């Protein structure tokens, strides 16, 4: 291993180093201690390479320096390295770890859930994927009445995600209870019924029907338009969100996940309002709204103009919403805090871990299911 004594014995006139930050910090220290000039090649993330973005700026004793224009090689004497931080020791595992989580009084065997609208009723993917490996499967969005959904183009790919305008096409809650739910309950995972509605009455009546079934968990989607409020989503204001959750909570004792809309101006306020009204968990990171224009025809791509947008591009925003909501819940007594199910751009296990570190208990995978079931 390189040491101060080895540098002295080698008779070097100078030392040049490049590599990971902890190594460079060490080389700087021993070279300067040995009295040997040291020059270090610094690497930093950059966007332009022209000295414009300032993303590659490093802090030195002579002020800020740009790696791309002022470097990348610097005299080690002006460089300032952060103190090394040791990674926490890994705990040895004794057998298979317990990944189970609880939402209300229902236990899921692991924290991975197939998001509503992307996994059908759990049986459609049976030929390519065993849904029983999941912690839970959320059904398609269900409404009191059957819906045919939106006309026109329904899907539109972007360089970093997928836009959708399905329009909650579904067979209705009664059909779901009679034909789809029995098959979902046969899967070796937890079934979650996603409840959508356009009026308070349809939410309540739908919840009453689902409460009489064996479905373990209800997910209340308050991203749906509120007809009485001119079409604005129920979750856009604290008052409307609180009303919807309170009224549904009054007619069911099943664990209730509330799926929030990321468009809410006071997102954490809405989240706390839902908790006060009886939510057992919050689903954070539902589709963001976007607009696409067909430049060949000069008209919007979707008949409804606006469409949901999901995929890798939304993940940093969804992580922020999870982080802020988790921080906001610190104002509540521990027994009043609820689990967060994080949704938004999850492609791999590292993405899930990022959400969990930000404050989530579970994660929902949606758009990526279409790319790689």
PLM regions: where:
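C-terminal helical cap(s) of enzyme catalytic domains, especially alpha/beta-barrels
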Residues: 73-83, 149-160, 293-306, 368-373
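N-terminal capping/small domains of soluble enzymes
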Residues: 93-191, 196-204, 373
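Glycine-rich beta-to-alpha transition loops that act as phosphate-gripper elements at the mouths
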Residues: 119, 194-197, 260-266, 335-350
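Catalytic cores of alpha/beta
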Residues: 53-55, 123-129, 201-212, 264-277, ...
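Alpha/beta catalytic cores of nucleotide-metabolism and tRNA/nucleoside-modifying enzymes
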Residues: 68, 87-96, 309-337, 347-373
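Glycine/Thr-rich beta-alpha phosphate-binding loop at enzyme active sites
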Residues: 162-163, 170, 224-240, 270, ...
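Reductase modules of NAD(P)H-dependent flavoproteins
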Residues: 1-92
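Glycine-rich phosphate-binding active-site loops on the catalytic face of alpha/beta enzymes
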Residues: 20, 138-144, 222-224, 281-292, ...
């Amino acid at each position: 291993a390189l040491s101060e004594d080895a540098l002295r014995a080698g008779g070097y006139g100078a030392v040049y180093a490049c590599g990971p930050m902890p190594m460079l910090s060490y080389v700087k220290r021993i070279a300067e201690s040995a009295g040997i000039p040291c020059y270090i090649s610094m690497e930093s993330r950059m966007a332009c390479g022209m000295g414009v973005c300032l993303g590659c700026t490093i802090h030195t004793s002579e002020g800020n320096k740009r790696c791309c224009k002022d470097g990348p090689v610097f005299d080690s004497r002006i460089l300032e390295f952060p103190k090394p931080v040791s990674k926490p020791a890994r705990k040895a595992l004794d057998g298979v770890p317990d990944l189970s989580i609880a939402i209300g009084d229902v236990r899921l065997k692991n924290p991975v859930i197939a998001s509503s609208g992307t996994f059908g009723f759990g049986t459609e993917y049976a030929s390519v994927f065993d849904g029983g490996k999941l912690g839970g499967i959320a059904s398609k969005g269900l409404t009191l009445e059957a819906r045919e959904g939106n006309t026109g183009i329904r899907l539109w790919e972007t360089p970093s995600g997928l836009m959708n305008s399905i329009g909650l096409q579904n067979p209705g809650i009664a059909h779901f209870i009679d034909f789809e739910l029995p098959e979902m309950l046969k899967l070796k995972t937890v079934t979650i019924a996603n409840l959508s509605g356009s009026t308070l009455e349809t939410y309540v009546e739908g919840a009453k029907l689902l409460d009489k079934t064996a479905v373990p968990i209800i997910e209340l989607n308050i991203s749906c338009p509120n007809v009485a409020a001119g079409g604005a989503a129920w979750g856009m204001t604290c008052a409307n969100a609180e009303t919807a959750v309170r009224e549904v909570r009054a007619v069911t004792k099943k664990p209730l996940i509330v799926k929030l809309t990321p468009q809410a101006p006071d997102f954490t306020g809405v989240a706390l309002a839902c908790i006060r009204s009886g939510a057992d968990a919050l689903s954070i990171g539902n589709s963001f709204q976007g607009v696409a224009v067909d430049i060949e025809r000069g008209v919007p791509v979707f008949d409804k103009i606006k469409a949901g947008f999901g995929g890798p591009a939304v993940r940093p925003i969804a992580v922020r919403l999870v982080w802020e909501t988790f921080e906001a819940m610190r104002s509540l007594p521990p027994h009043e805090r609820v689990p967060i199910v994080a949704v938004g751009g999850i492609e791999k296990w590292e993405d899930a871990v990022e959400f969990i570190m930000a404050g989530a208990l579970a994660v929902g995978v949606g758009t990526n299911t279409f790319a790689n079931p």
